[in-house]
Amino acid sequence: MTKGLYTAYTGMINQMHRMDVLTNNLANSATNGFKKEGATSQAFDEVLAVKIKDTSDYGIPKGLGGVSLGVKIGETYTDYAQGPFRVTDNKFDFALDGDGFFAISFTNKAGESSVKYTRDGAFTLTKEGYLVTKDGDFVLNKDAALASDGNSAGGVPGGAIQLNPNLDFKVDEEGRIIQDGEEVATLGVVDIEDYNYIKKYGENLYDLQEGGVVTDSTAKVRQETLEMSNVNVVYEMVEMITTTRAYETNQKVIQAIDDSLSKAANDVGRV
C-alpha cells in the first residue's frame, strides 16, 4: 500500500512537468517561429532497467522493495515542424520555407558574443545599414554563418550584413540580397546536421552544442513574410485539461491510501 503512495506521488510530479511544458507552449503561441515542446515519461520497466545507473534524486526512497516506484520524467523534446506563414508586407520580415535557421551574432548582458540560431525573421535596419534582430543583434551573412562553430562568427561586424540604408532592396529565395541591381550579401541561412546537437537557449534562440555541425540549408527565403508558432492552441488546451485530470486522479489515490492507512492504524488497532 505504501508503494502506491510513491507511485501516485511520481505521477503527480510527472503531470506538473507536463503542465509546465504546456503552459510555456501556450505562452509562446504568438511568438514568431517558436517551436513547441513536448514531454515524455518512462514506464516502470524502463525505469527499472536504468535504475542502477540513475544518479538523479527525486526524493523517492530507493530501498522500498525490489520494484521501481511510479513513473519517471523523461526528456523534453522540441517539435521542429513548420509553422504557418503570415504575409506582413514589411521588407525586413523573412520566413524560411524548409529546414534551417537564421544565424545571428548574439551579445549577452555580460557583453560576450556568440553565434545563435533562430527561426524568427523579424529584422530591422540600423542607421548605419546593418541588418539586425529586434533586439539589436547582427544578422550574419552566409560565409560567416557557415564558418561559425557556434562560438564566433569570424569578424563581426565584418560578418554582419550591411546595406545602403538609402536604397531599396530585394531578397530572392536563395537569400541573396539585391540592391541597385547588384548582389550585396546573402542571408546566413544554415542548418544543423543533427538536431540533437542544438537546444533552446531562450529569447527564441537556439544554441549549438559541442559536436554539432553547421551545414548549408535548402530552405527557401520568403521576404515580407513571417513564420508563426507551430503551437496548436486548441490541442494544447485539451492536453492541459487531460493533464489536470490526471494530476487530480493521483491526488485522490493518495487521499484514498491515506484514509486506508489511518483506518488500519486507528480503527483496526483498537480491535
Regions found by a protein language model. Give the residues of each.
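Amphipathic alpha-helical polymerization modules
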Residues: 1-271
